[in-house]
Amino acid sequence: MNDQEKSYQKILPELGDKTLVIPFTGDVNFSESEVVDRLIEIFGEVEIVPGISSIQVAASRAKVPLDKSKVITMHVTTPIEDKKLELQKALIDGFSVVLVPRPWPKQPDKHFMPSEIAIYLRENGFETTKMKVHVFEAITTENETNFEGTVKDLEGKEFSDLSVMVFNQASLDSYMNYRWQWEN
């Protein structure tokens, strides 16, 4: 972040009427709000141009509808204790969850990746041997991988910082279950 900040401060006085483009590797509307907020503080008006997010792609690959899911990011610098409780509640309430974990390898107390999440859920009473999960890494790239198994299987496994988890609790619920809409 220090180099990033230095770059912004160097560019600011030279920018004038020119347009500055800052590409993001993540979802600018999801896990990058702290950076966007800083850009607004420095440059004032900014235009955000969204793309297809890894969240959308992961949900699609896992066949988990976002309208029946909770989307949670742990990929923030602020404390995540409330987000951990939000994860528990969503799973207890039967929602699928699409989750961006928190890579922080230099500070193990803040590192909350799939293995740590699996242990956390088990320690909080979840039957992780019965919970289905996908972990997608480097999604939409030639290096994309997909782990599919149970949450218990994640314990001790390492995943990259380019990971998205999908806890799949979805069940089919097509419009055929709601015939009252068109039948008299």
Model-inferred region functions:
Residues M1-Q4, T73-T77, A138:
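Short beta->alpha junction loops
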Residues N2-K6, E34, S53, D82, ...:
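Conserved active-site and cofactor/substrate-binding residues in soluble primary-metabolism enzymes
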Residues G16, I42, P65, E127-T129:
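Short, structurally constrained coil/turn elements
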Residues M1-V49, S163-V164:
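Class I S-adenosyl-L-methionine
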Residues T19-L20, L91-N184:
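A contiguous loop/helix-start segment that scaffolds small-molecule binding in enzyme catalytic cores
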